[in-house]
Regions:
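Structural helix C-cap motif within protein kinase domains
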Residues: 13-16
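Conserved active-site beta-strand element of glycosyltransferases/polysaccharide synthases
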Residues: 19
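Conserved terminal C-lobe alpha helix of the protein kinase catalytic domain
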Residues: 24-27, 46-54
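Short proline-rich PxxP-based motifs
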Residues: 32-42
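A conserved short helix/loop substructure at the end of the activation segment
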Residues: 52-69, 78
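C-terminal regulatory tails of eukaryotic serine/threonine kinases
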Residues: 68-131
Length: 131
């Protein structure tokens, strides 16, 4: 569900939620869930859409939206006519400016590495507990 939050953020904002040149700082931002809705790109996005992203990008998995909860969110279940009225052209232009392939690949690599590190940490702790 967290990954879905990242994808929705990119689709609605035109750029990823976690951007940093320094990989260590990028990992820190991801682990702490530090991202922003910059008014320049998010001014046209509804509060319901931002709320959905916030609930999906919650760091603690026990309080993060489940798939069922996300599907019942107001933004997901909104009338098609409301969505049709939204102009996403601004997002498309921002997305074109963004070097998506390179940055997204780096973000995915970061998530994969963070998951591997978390898994190694759990394995290490488990081995210590068993000793």
């Amino acid at each position: 569900m967290w990954s879905l939050g990242v994808i929705v953020y990119i689709l609605l904002g035109g750029y990823p939620p976690f951007i940093e040149q320094n990989q260590r700082e990028l990992f820190r931002k991801i682990r702490k869930g530090q991202y922003e809705f910059h008014e320049e790109y998010w001014g046209q996005v509804s509060d319901d859409g931002k709320n959905l992203i916030t609930k999906l990008l919650t760091v603690d998995p026990s309080t993060r939206f489940s798939a069922d909860t996300a599907l019942s969110n107001k933004w997901i279940s909104a009338d098609d006519s409301k969505l049709a009225a939204q102009d996403l052209g601004v997002n498309l232009e921002q997305f074109k400016k963004f070097n998506a392939k390179r940055k997204f690949k780096a973000a995915v690599s970061t998530v994969v590495a963070a998951n591997k590190l978390a898994s190694l940490g759990m394995d290490f702790k488990k081995n210590l507990d068993e000793s």
